[in-house]
Amino acid sequence: MAIYEAGEMYLLTIYLLYQKGMKKVRAIDVCREINRSKPSVSIALSQLKEEDYISVTNGKIDLKEKGIDVAKRVLSRREAVSKMFEKIGVDKEISKKDACKIEHVISDEACEAIQKFIGE
């Protein structure tokens, strides 16, 4: 089953929280990070768990291999689009905000072309 945009965002959020040095990411941490309600996050996490993107043990959320792959792919897209926007003269903060919106819909082919364009 293909991952949906919101699912990508949850996986990326979990991934980034661990990258920031959190030892134990819980649902409440995800709620705070993306400003969503506990019920919304719980539903999304249940779906991600059912689809084998994450595991949850004693409240601790762990990304499984395919969850990590999705998070890294989305982050790579975000960084490529943001860098491209900056390269063509868009303000850094606007570049980040716009890239966050585009990262879920851009094709692999377009992302690869952007990465070549920016020299990565």
Report the location of each language-model feature:
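N-terminal positioning helix adjacent to the helix-turn-helix/winged-helix DNA-binding module
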Residues: 6-10, 77, 110
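Basic amphipathic alpha-helical segments that dock to polyanions
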Residues: 10, 30, 41-49
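Residues within the alpha-helical elements of helix-turn-helix
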Residues: 33, 70, 87
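Key DNA-contact positions within bacterial/archaeal DNA-binding proteins
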Residues: 39, 93
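A short, conserved structural fragment
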Residues: 49-59
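C-terminal regulatory/oligomerization modules of transcriptional regulators
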Residues: 97-120
